[in-house]
Amino acid sequence: MVGIQRLIKHDDGTVQEISITADGWVKESYYKKKTPVKPDSNPGVKYEELEPVHRVFSKKPTCQQLFFYLLFWWTYLTIVVLLTVPLNPYQIHRSYRLMMGPASYPINCNRATPDRYSRSCFSSFFCTWDIFMPEIKVQNETFYPNFTKSDGSPADYSSALLWATSFITNPNCTNFTVLYSDSSNSSQRNDSDYEVATFVMLEGLFMLRHKCHPETVYLGRRRCGAHRWRFVNVYDTSYLNHSTCSFDWASLSNASYTPQLGPNCSMANLTEEELKSGFYLHLQQVEIKPSQ
């Protein structure tokens, strides 16, 4: 409340006034009689104002102070939560293969140098060390991730991967097999091998869909916070074709295709850490068998 809050009369006749200004400051003023008089002998005697000894002692909290106070604690708690939950690797529960498998995420989530990226409109995968895309085996044809087919001629691996991913993620489509580099295989949904296979294939499609902007994607063995906070959905399935299980593989095999391939990968450029990562298990082949 603005205005005089308290009046105090001391034994020497000095009057102390405590008030609050419009700015929220606490002000103390002292007044003394001009001539000494007996107490209460002449109530009409005027008082003179003395220079305040301490004009301001404190200030009441304002909305601005409260805002910065709350902002400080909100920032502090946010940092604590980030360090203890989403950025804590011990909080990530995944199977062995899921942890070791390739993962893609936006470039702003890593600190790789610019020369690690292909900066052109290539239709192939990036020349990166830790991504292993599967062969797509269908009927009498096999599509390879280097954009060739069984006879070595160019082929549209991008469409083949899209169809194969649509097939194995469609609950109405059956009769498929995923094969890993250790010769283990699975033809069942909802197990770890199937889950990892779908993740790897969706990551490959994510890269191919951004082929004209390869600098926006980087491949690594860990998923970054942006994807885990769902700012980027690497595993989006909305664009897949789940309307059919009968894809025209023969037409895709016979179609002419000229891929715009990126630079060849050179093993000499790999670091020791990158070479070691190549020993991890990876998805080797996805076989789509004809319906019976």
Swiss-Prot record:
**Keywords annotated in UniProt:** Host membrane, Membrane, Transmembrane, Transmembrane helix
Instruction: State which residue ranges cross the membrane.
Output: 66-86
Its main localization is host cell
Gene Ontology cellular component annotations, sorted alphabetically: host cell membrane; membrane
According to the lineage, what is the superkingdom?
Viruses
As for membrane topology, the entry says: Single-pass membrane protein
Compartment(s) of residence: Host membrane
According to UniProt, the name of this protein is Uncharacterized gene 27 protein
